[in-house]
Regions:
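Terminal amphipathic alpha-helical/low-complexity segments used for targeting or macromolecular assembly
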Residues: 1-53, 102, 107-130
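A detector of tandem-repeat and repeat-rich interaction/domain scaffolds
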Residues: 53-108
Length: 130
């Protein structure tokens, strides 16, 4: 079976995050739908298995563990996808969102989690104190 040709490579730039060594990615092809060009740096992955198809991880976003981002999904900002989570289709996970456990996100479909921005969490906490 032929190995899937990847659209990115893991660079030598690494960070330690939650006890895992994550590598910054670099684009090997243009991905026009995300305004990514050959040579652009993206976010961080633990392994090649974390990212497939045309999906992209940008900025300081992190994907690790058995988590998989596929299809045309995009993870960016400071978002984290980990454990056994799956993000696929045309889904977008961004800002400080965390997708973990066995959560699954596809397009606008969410299963197994709620996503809140930090601003939304702060608002909820303020309302609870009243």
């Amino acid at each position: 079976m032929e190995r899937e040709k990847k659209h990115f490579k893991l660079t030598d730039e690494t960070i330690n995050f939650n006890g895992k060594t994550l590598h910054r990615i670099e684009a090997l092809v243009d991905i026009p739908c995300f305004a990514v060009s050959v040579g652009d740096l993206g976010g961080f992955l633990e392994s090649y298995n974390n990212l497939c198809d045309n999906a992209w991880v940008g900025n300081e976003a992190k994907v690790y563990g058995n988590a998989v981002v596929t299809g045309n999904a995009r993870i960016f900002g400071s978002a984290v996808v980990c454990d056994n989570a799956q993000v696929y289709g045309d889904a977008c996970v961004y800002d400080s969102a965390i997708v973990s456990g066995y959560a699954s996100i596809s397009n606008n479909y969410r299963q197994g989690l709620l996503l809140f921005s930090r601003a939304a969490l702060a608002l909820i906490k303020r309302k609870r104190k009243r």
